Amino acid sequence: MLTKKEQRLRRSRQTRIRIAQQGVARLTVNRTNLHIYANVISDDGSKVLASASTAEAEVRQSLGAAGKGGNAAAARIIGLRIAEKAKAAGIQKVAFDRAGFAYHGRVKALADAAREAGLQF
């Protein structure tokens, strides 16, 4: 019997395979209790084209004195930021890779913000 973590990792591997067949860059999301990370990875998986996280100094300053990166408001900031960076790198369309995390809460907030900022997925 697989643990929750093993199940999530298995789902993420299967998703990565499906996304690789599409031939578009992928927007990956990783979340921890304290931070959320987003990367735009090239279609062949060899390069990180853009990245944003709540661990960045500029983002921590914009979050205020509390500096909490583990909430939906912080995820929304990261979604807007990753969309800006991806557009600056010339990327308009991505495949969303949630890495096995449920599409709820912080992951959903990041995805919605990235869509609002102009990324298509």
Curated annotation (Swiss-Prot):
Source organism (scientific name): Verminephrobacter eiseniae (strain EF01-2)
Taxonomic superkingdom: Bacteria
One Pfam assignment: Ribosomal_L18p
Task of the protein: This is one of the proteins that bind and probably mediate the attachment of the 5S RNA into the large ribosomal subunit, where it forms part of the central protuberance.
Biological processes per GO annotation: translation
The protein's assembly and partners: Part of the 50S ribosomal subunit; part of the 5S rRNA/L5/L18/L25 subcomplex. Contacts the 5S and 23S rRNAs.
Record GO terms (molecular function): 5S rRNA binding; structural constituent of ribosome
GO cellular component entries: cytosolic large ribosomal subunit
InterPro entries: Ribosomal_uL18_bac-type (IPR004389), Ribosomal_uL18_bac/euk (IPR005484)
Similarity remark: Belongs to the universal ribosomal protein uL18 family.
Annotated TM spans: none
Keywords noted in UniProt: Ribonucleoprotein, Ribosomal protein, RNA-binding, rRNA-binding
SUPFAM superfamilies reported in the protein's UniProt record: Translational machinery components
Lineage of origin: Bacteria, Pseudomonadati, Pseudomonadota, Betaproteobacteria, Burkholderiales
Protein name: Large ribosomal subunit protein uL18
